[in-house]
């Protein structure tokens, strides 16, 4: 294949994945040159960026833009939603800020405080002071997501110095409302927010590289032509005891590996 013109190699590479292109760039100098082509990386960038998207300055190549969107999520829609790309596939990822979520009693200072923490994407996160009724819901338009892709939604959080009341499981659901998909079903499940609460495999939180925890709320498949909203929620409203110490970063929606 080294005898093929570089533009032909670039065309072939554009039919693979970003991960494959990075691997194949080590084959030879002509592959390395073709792997840096804008034609290749245009194929991996979305054809329809979300409204409000503005490419960062100082990125002269499409490859640089791609990896900037992988490593540095961009804020859109003010400061309530971040947009990024998944490294292996180039599929779209989003994270909804805590302020974009419907948190019951979230505007009552005796129950929740809105605080700023370093090294976060958004200006504020929500710190739980005390509630008995915990209910958090987020919605996102399914048309923002990449077609023909399996997605998962993750609740992203951490604890302050004195968490209390979270030893019991928390109920979650994921609803594909008003879509044309045949999979527009509710996925109720029980998860643990505490790592040592004995939750089932896959239902306990995982520590992320950024120092926050995440726990999966559910999965859904985005088909071409799907319309409507995805509603993601978690709640604990049955326990007769107070809950406190939870810090909410947001909900992240990204492709399943």
From Swiss-Prot:
GO molecular function ontology, one term from the record: carbohydrate binding
SMART domains the record matches: FBOX (SM00256)
Pathway(s) it belongs to: Protein modification; protein ubiquitination
SUPFAM superfamilies (alphabetical): F-box domain
Gene3D superfamilies to which the protein is assigned, alphabetical: 1.20.1280.50
Gene Ontology CC annotations of this record: nucleus
Keyword Nucleus found: yes
Lineage: superkingdom: Eukaryota
Pfam families, per database record: F-box, PP2
Predominant location category: nucleus
GO BP term (any one): protein ubiquitination
Compartments (UniProt record): Nucleus
Residues annotated as domain F-box: 1-44
Role played: Component of SCF(ASK-cullin-F-box) E3 ubiquitin ligase complexes, which may mediate the ubiquitination and subsequent proteasomal degradation of target proteins.
Subunit structure: Part of a SCF (ASK-cullin-F-box) protein ligase complex. Interacts with SKP1A/ASK1 and SPK1B/ASK2.
Record text about domains: The F-box is necessary for the interaction with ASK proteins.
Name the record gives this protein: F-box protein PP2-B11
Species for this entry: Arabidopsis thaliana
Lineage: Eukaryota, Viridiplantae, Streptophyta, Embryophyta, Tracheophyta
């Amino acid at each position: 294949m080294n005898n093929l013109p570089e533009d032909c190699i670039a065309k072939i590479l554009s039919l693979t994945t970003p991960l494959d292109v990075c691997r194949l760039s080590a084959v030879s100098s002509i592959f390395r040159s073709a792997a840096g082509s804008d034609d290749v990386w245009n194929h991996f960038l979305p054809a329809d960026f979300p409204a409000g998207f503005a490419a960062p300055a100082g990125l002269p190549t499409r490859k640089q833009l791609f990896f900037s969107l992988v490593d540095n999520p961009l804020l859109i829609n003010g400061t309530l939603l971040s947009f990024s790309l998944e490294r292996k596939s180039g599929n779209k990822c989003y994270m909804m800020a805590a302020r974009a979520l419907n948190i019951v009693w979230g505007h009552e200072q005796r129950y929740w405080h809105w605080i700023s923490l370093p090294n976060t994407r958004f200006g504020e996160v929500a710190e739980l002071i005390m509630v008995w009724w915990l209910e958090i819901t987020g919605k996102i338009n399914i048309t923002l997501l990449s077609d023909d892709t399996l997605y998962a939604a993750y609740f992203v959080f951490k604890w302050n110095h004195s968490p209390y009341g979270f030893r019991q499981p928390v109920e979650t659901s994921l609803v594909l409302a008003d879509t044309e998909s045949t999979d527009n079903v509710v996925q109720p499940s029980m998860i643990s927010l505490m790592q040592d609460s004995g939750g089932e495999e896959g239902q306990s939180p995982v520590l992320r590289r950024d120092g926050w925890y995440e726990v999966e709320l559910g999965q859904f498949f985005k088909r071409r032509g799907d319309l409507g909203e995805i509603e993601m929620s978690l709640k604990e409203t049955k326990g007769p005891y107070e809950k406190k110490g939870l810090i909410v970063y947001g909900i992240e929606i990204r492709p399943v590996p």
